[in-house]
Amino acid sequence: CSTSRLNNGYLYVFSQYSVNNPEEERKEQYIPCVNEELLSLDKICMPDTESARNYTVITAIDIQNPSETTDSIGILSDQGLCYASAENIYLYETIWEEDGGRTTEIRKFSYGEGKLTGVAKTRVNGYLNDSFSIDEYNGYLRLVTTVDRTNAVYVLDEKLEETGKIENLAKDERIYSARFMGDIGYFVTYRETEPLFSVDLSDPANPKIIGELKIPGFSEYLHPYGDGLLLGIGMEDDGNDEKDRRVKLSMFDISDPSNVKEIDKIVLKDSYYSTAFEDYKSVLADAEKNLIGFFTYGERETYHIYGYDRVHGFTCKMQETTGKYAWHVRGVYLQDTFYLIDGNQIESYRLADFEKVDDLIL
């Protein structure tokens, strides 16, 4: 993972370093450097596997004195991903076992005041769909994984020791999306219908499935949308073939987690795929401004903005055709103006009615 986190005046930078056919006498070919200095051995974490060729290097920088690093650590792995809570960093990667099964190795590091400390590591069965499948809350780590042809929920304590689990969920399906919200977790599996599961995690030793809603299609991305609502962006079949799938917006009422309801949906007949499925940062979801912005491929490449209220359901505010290969289209707003960024072109619109104001080609 190449990313960064800002926490209490310190910037934590995550960078990658790959090792390829190093010469033993040239240490810089297999030991990461920070500020042109090799990491010391006590700052390198080794894996159990012998095949790791990639480092994730975490570097702490005091933003008041950015020319100096306060700490660095290198974790050797095979292209792991990262999740950061307010106090801890978790690096996780999928491990292929000899029997063909998959497990997830998790390593935990505490961070604060510019210091990084290794805490614990463990493995759980299965693999994580994305970073929304892992969450820390009140000192416990909660995960939802796909295990072979079933799925599981795991709860781990501060030492990454298992306190509770639910296994053998949704046979022959896999997890498509997840979202943890306090003591409740939601996750979607799919084969022919979309089961949206609700799990009560208030007792770390005894997680319980408390709800299961089955509807057509599936949600690839879940996002809280105001009080008691959960937005889903996914797909629904428009026929008997996967080629007939179309992008779908769903709004779920989660005011009662044991009785979740899909209270509205809209299927975009001309949209076959959305970047929301792979990159959540491409989605603009703001309940206060009532904005749901996302990009789709289909009959034409389009950036959509929808709103939602309980009386009218989903309403379209704007549909703007973008460039043909506009994978990185983004929508943002500042005060009363919405900006659509498409490659080297920026367009501005009034938030009140989405009338175009201006455009700029860089």
Please place each PLM-identified region on the residue numbering.
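Beta-sheet-rich non-transmembrane sensory/scaffold domains
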Residues: 1-362
